[in-house]
């Protein structure tokens, strides 16, 4: 058991100046070090709390399992000038240390791997490694793969002759086709544009049909931007039949066929009593725009 500990047993003010008030602003000046006063005060508070929880618990006298790490804020400034680790000083990094090494004399004329850093490295410590793994591009991997196939083909060409060359060409064609298939997936547009199409709706539950001459869809797709709601059951429907605004028979926006397949007047392209979703919106069905909107 530890004896009772008084949390206010730290060093007190020098009583030589009897007339000094405790509210004086420079009361910390009589201490030898302000940091010692703060450490003793915090240690006293911690020890008082630990004595209330469990008398056997006492704060450790020293830090355990700690490491000194220096952080350089400005990478352009010299590390030795900016900060230090006690007696140790941060090692200075040469300005040309991150540059790629020159190619060897015996190496073939192949594209070297480029090193790209996503952000500036500002931590200098013995734990952090000086070198970072380079980010390999897919194009470099494909070229290296082609070079490996060529080297294997050159060794096998001496034995098999023209048969090995044909296999190499087939392998290169397959790599090119794979690269072309992967290209459209990578180059997807960041923005999606809207276009207007003709939509035909039918609610099987209520047995109601309605048409819309101008339905806002995502460009080159049948994905409707504004859903249609039935006037009775209020169910949302995507048109199961979306076509171009132009008539398929006469190829005109305003149909002039004797037998009209579409019963929509372009002047009133949509029956608002059946669709209350887009009424009053900026992209309403009864408004026609000659330009595209970006989602």
From Swiss-Prot:
One Gene Ontology term from the biological process aspect of the record: translation
Bias type Basic and acidic residues, positions: 144-176
Cellular compartments annotated: Cytoplasm, Cytoplasmic ribonucleoprotein granule
Annotated effect of mutating residue 203 to A: Abolished binding to the 3'-UTR of mRNAs
Main localization, broad class: cytoplasm
ZnF (3CxxC-type) ranges: 197-280
Alphabetized GO MF terms: mRNA 3'-UTR binding; zinc ion binding
InterPro entries, per the entry: Zar1, ZAR1/RTP1-5-like_Znf-3CxxC
Region (Disordered): 80-115, 144-186
Any single Gene Ontology cellular-component annotation: cytoplasm
Outcome of mutating residue 247 to A: Abolished binding to the 3'-UTR of mRNAs
Keywords from the UniProt entry: Cytoplasm, Developmental protein, Differentiation, Metal-binding, Oogenesis, RNA-binding, Zinc, Zinc-finger
Tissue-level expression: Ovary. Also expressed in lung and muscle.
Protein family per UniProt: Belongs to the ZAR1 family.
Role summary: mRNA-binding protein required for maternal mRNA storage, translation and degradation during oocyte maturation. Probably promotes formation of some phase-separated membraneless compartment that stores maternal mRNAs in oocytes: acts by undergoing liquid-liquid phase separation upon binding to maternal mRNAs. Binds to the 3'-UTR of maternal mRNAs in immature oocytes, inhibiting their translation.
UniProt free text on domains: Disordered regions undergo liquid-liquid phase separation (LLPS) for the formation of membraneless compartments that store maternal mRNAs in oocytes. The 3CxxC-type mediates binding to the 3'-UTR of mRNAs.
Protein name, entry field: Zygote arrest protein 1.S
């Amino acid at each position: 058991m530890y004896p009772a500990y008084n949390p206010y047993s730290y060093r007190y003010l020098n009583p030589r100046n009897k007339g000094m008030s405790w509210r004086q602003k420079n009361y910390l000046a009589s201490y030898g070090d302000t940091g010692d006063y703060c450490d003793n005060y915090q240690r006293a508070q911690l020890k008082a709390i630990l004595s209330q929880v469990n008398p056997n618990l006492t704060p450790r006298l020293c830090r355990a399992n700690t490491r000194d790490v220096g952080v350089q804020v400005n990478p352009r400034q010299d590390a030795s000038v900016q900060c230090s680790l006690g007696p140790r000083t941060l090692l200075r990094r040469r300005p040309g240390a991150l540059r790629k090494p020159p190619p060897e004399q015996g190496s073939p004329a192949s594209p070297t791997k480029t090193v790209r850093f996503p952000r500036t490295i500002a931590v200098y410590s013995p734990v952090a490694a000086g070198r970072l793994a380079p980010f390999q591009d897919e194009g470099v991997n494909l070229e290296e793969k082609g070079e490996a196939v060529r080297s294997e083909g050159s060794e096998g060409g001496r034995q098999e002759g023209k048969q090995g060359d044909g296999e190499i060409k087939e392998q290169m064609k397959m790599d090119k086709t794979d690269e072309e298939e992967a290209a459209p997936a990578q180059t997807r547009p960041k923005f999606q544009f809207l276009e207007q199409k003709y939509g035909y709706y039918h609610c099987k539950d209520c047995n109601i049909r309605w048409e819309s001459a101008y339905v806002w869809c995502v460009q080159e797709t049948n994905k409707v931007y504004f859903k249609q709601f039935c006037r009775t059951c209020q169910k949302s429907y995507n048109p199961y039949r979306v076509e171009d605004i132009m008539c398929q028979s006469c190829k005109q926006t305003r149909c002039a066929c004797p037998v009209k397949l579409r019963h929509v007047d372009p002047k009133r392209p949509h029956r608002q009593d059946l669709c209350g979703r887009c009424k009053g919106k900026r992209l309403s069905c009864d408004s026609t725009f000659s330009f595209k909107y970006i989602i």
